């Protein structure tokens, strides 16, 4: 949806960062509306915000370990899993996150969320501010994460690219769901093209 449609607010509501005033949020049939973020993390929900998504004074390794703070076992297995998805980070684990590029910070943020082995991953604008090449990498990583069995809910301004890789899409308008369908259906829907995709949909 367009700017101000409520996309990021929706993710924040799911993750307990803003108050839900109506409706319900269910996870496998369990009511989770209004739970605090730490309770949602314990239930297997990870969240990657668009900005301020790393601890800049900590190393990459320390950032990843922060994501496993609720797990009792060693974080080594989790770090190995994250390095499999983001091999560019492997030789730089002791580098401070504050020195990384936007795309590299996004990798660290996604990796930290994955350290808890979430059932659901919420991603807010994973391609924001990235070069076209880095955007392609970000979408590839999102697809790979999803293929590991993690359900992924992604808010994304690059609607065309997002719809190309998603199972289902939801177009928001003024806080309400205006259109729903598979990615292909929405890419080919004349109303969605005219109202939201413009030339991007052609």
PLM regions: where:
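Glycine-rich phosphate-binding loops of nucleotide-dependent enzymes
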Residues: 1-202
């Amino acid at each position: 949806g367009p700017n101000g449609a409520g996309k990021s607010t929706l993710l924040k509501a799911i993750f307990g960062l803003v108050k839900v005033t109506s409706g319900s949020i269910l996870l496998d049939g369990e009511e989770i509306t209004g739970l605090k973020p730490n309770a949602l993390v314990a239930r297997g929900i990870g969240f990657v915000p668009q900005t301020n998504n790393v601890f800049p004074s900590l190393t990459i390794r320390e950032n990843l370990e922060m994501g496993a703070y609720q797990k009792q076992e060693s974080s080594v297995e989790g770090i190995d899993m994250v390095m499999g998805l983001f091999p560019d980070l492997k030789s730089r684990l002791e580098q401070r996150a504050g020195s990384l590029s936007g795309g590299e910070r996004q990798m660290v943020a996604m990796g930290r969320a994955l350290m808890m082995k979430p059932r659901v991953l919420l991603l807010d604008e994973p391609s924001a501010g990235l070069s076209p090449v880095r955007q392609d990498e970000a979408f590839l990583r999102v697809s790979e994460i999803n293929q590991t069995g993690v359900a992924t809910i992604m808010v994304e301004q690059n609607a065309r690219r997002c719809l190309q890789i998603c199972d289902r899409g939801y177009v928001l308008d003024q806080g309400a769901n205006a259109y729903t369908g598979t990615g292909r259906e929405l890419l080919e829907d004349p109303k969605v093209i005219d109202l939201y995709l413009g030339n991007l949909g052609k």
